[in-house]
Swiss-Prot record:
Highest taxon of source: Eukaryota
Annotated uDENN domain residues: 31-185
Residue span(s) of domain cDENN: 211-365
Ranges of residues in domain dDENN: 367-513
Further comment: Present with 2550 molecules/cell in log phase SD medium.
Subcellular location: Lipid droplet
Main location: other
PTM note: Palmitoylated by AKR1.
Keywords of the record: Lipid droplet, Lipoprotein, Palmitate
Keyword Lipoprotein: yes
Name of the protein described by the UniProt record: Uncharacterized protein ANR2
């Protein structure tokens, strides 16, 4: 980890969701606008586009990004994506830059079926209207208030409601060979125009769509204790693929990618200015056409992306873990089916027993929910069984204290969720829950970083080539599971990533006295 002594240019004390939501009024200039279409004979095609003069934006395969496989099962949807800039031969994702894009999709096939009781292919219309933002040249006062990376990853979304309105107007005009409405919108809001007029706030703006961060409570409920191994993987900058199930909204699934990116961020006051290399990269919707781009991401410089193309899972060299979601009907109506997290080798990645305990005793309280019997069973299905050693120690405490005391390692869940009312919308509990959850994970990350840093600094006299040995009981201080091999490996990996130091963890029997 880069730990230069320079003072950070941006120093937010805590995550503030009001600043994030209010920034919706600030819209960066558009570098490119395009219209793609699904043609019954030709497939996905671009039928119109316009870019600012001198913009080196590669629109190759943009028709597949804006019309990903499976989107035809939605009446309308929003698709996030990135457009990589040209890769040099020796360039890696650590230096790769890309532009963020968004497209609004709309089709009429379901209306045709409802009206005619059959599908007339000659009448089917499937369009995606999209914009691309060159975030390298974007300017916003938001950068002064909170992480510019959060702003960049969401920059294109600030146009989603406008694209919805524009595409609807264009379809209603019935002359589908006229693009004047798009031309006018681009001329008023392109990067060159807005650079001269600062950040423009639109008059008579259409109603904003939900901010992607507002889906965090939803995903925390659906993932259950699996939110924790996903958070740990994001801190390690694993390459994470989220598999979009059949019939699911791309907007919903991309919100998970954004939320994973958001909760993984390291506070800038810990790591200084050199932060761009330390975040997992949200690249949103990808397909087989993006394989060369995905191959540029090496282990430890990861991404979080969504895909509806299961064929990508047959290329384990391009990802570390895959999150297999259930379809919306399954999520809502058949909760017995659980989300799965699998490694590239096909092994299931489960939550630790402590993750489960923290989720049920802490996170569910924040979500204002009680664990039902069915939910408890489902949570246990995605959790590792407790070790025999923990079983014996728990039994010892139960017998000798009549259940009055528990072993110290259970007290890790006393790590409280920071509560903070930051905005003028106290009635919107979901927004407040989202903020509290983000701040909880940021605080856990900060504590993990600081505690490991203290241990390493106290061992400075040890040869840097020699591993630093810590007791397994120390993981309790880190709010991790001292019995779990998974958490043992996580501590070793994160210490090596952040501090370039190797750590050994003592065998559990050696620390039994500390635990008892």
């Amino acid at each position: 980890m880069n730990s230069g002594g320079e003072e950070p240019t941006i120093k937010p004390n805590v995550f503030n969701i009001t600043q994030l939501l209010n920034s919706n009024g600030e819209k960066p200039g558009i570098a490119c606008i395009f219209l793609s279409k699904f043609d019954m004979k030709k497939g996905n095609i671009i039928i119109w586009s316009k870019s600012i003069n001198g913009a080196a934006i590669d629109l190759s395969n943009i028709e597949f990004k804006s019309l990903p496989a499976g989107i035809h099962e939605q009446t309308d949807d929003v698709v996030n994506f990135v457009v990589p800039k040209e890769l040099d031969v020796c360039q890696t994702a650590k230096t790769t830059t890309y532009d963020y894009g968004i497209a609004y999709f709309k089709q009429n096939s379901f209306d045709i079926i409802e009206n005619d009781n059959r599908i007339d292919r000659s009448k089917v219309q499937m369009f995606s209207l999209g914009v691309i933002i060159d975030v390298q040249n974007a300017s916003s006062d938001s950068k002064k208030h909170f992480y510019k990376e959060i702003y960049h990853a969401y920059a294109a979304n600030r146009y989603s409601s406008y694209l919805e309105s524009l595409l609807g107007q264009w379809i209603r005009q019935r002359d589908l060979d006229k693009f004047d409405i798009f031309e006018k919108f681009f001329d008023e809001n392109n990067q060159g125009h807005m650079a001269e007029n600062s950040v423009e706030v639109f008059e008579h703006s259409p109603k904003e769509r939900r901010h992607l961060v507002e889906y965090l409570p939803y995903w925390t409920r659906k993932l259950g204790p699996l939110i924790f191994p996903l958070w740990k993987a994001s801190l390690l900058q694993s390459r994470i693929l989220i598999l979009v199930p059949q019939g699911e909204s791309f907007e919903l699934c991309n919100s998970l990618a954004y939320c994973v990116f958001l909760i993984s961020m390291l506070p800038k006051n810990l790591i200084g200015n050199h932060v761009s290399d330390e975040y997992i990269k949200p690249i949103f919707t990808v397909s087989t056409s993006d394989i060369p781009f995905l191959e540029s991401f090496k282990k430890g410089n990861g991404y979080v992306a969504t895909t509806s193309e299961e064929i990508l899972l047959y290329k384990p060299e391009i990802y570390d873990i895959v999150v297999k979601l259930t379809s919306s009907s399954t999520i809502e109506e058949s909760p017995e089916k659980e989300v799965e997290i699998l490694t590239a080798s096909g092994e299931q990645n489960k939550a630790t027993p402590l993750d489960l305990e923290v989720y049920e005793k802490l996170i569910l309280g924040e979500l204002q929910e009680d664990a039902s019997t069915n939910a408890t069973c489902r949570h246990h299905e995605v959790t590792e069984p407790i070790s025999w050693l923990q079983f014996l120690i728990d039994g010892f405490f139960l017998l000798t204290t009549a259940g009055y005391l528990v072993a110290p390692y259970h007290l890790a869940n006393n790590f409280k969720i920071p509560r903070h009312v930051s905005g003028p919308e106290p009635n919107n509990s979901e927004i407040q829950i989202a903020e509290n959850l983000v701040r909880y994970f940021h605080r856990r990350t900060s504590n993990l970083y600081n505690d490991l840093k203290d241990v390493i600094q106290k061992s400075e006299n040890i040869d840097s080539e020699q591993p630093i040995t810590i007791a397994a009981s120390f993981l309790t201080k880190l709010n991790l599971d001292c019995f779990s091999k998974q958490d043992h490996q996580f501590v070793k990996d994160i210490a090596l990533k952040w501090f370039q130091r190797s750590i050994d963890i003592s065998n559990l029997p050696e620390c039994l006295g500390n635990l008892c």
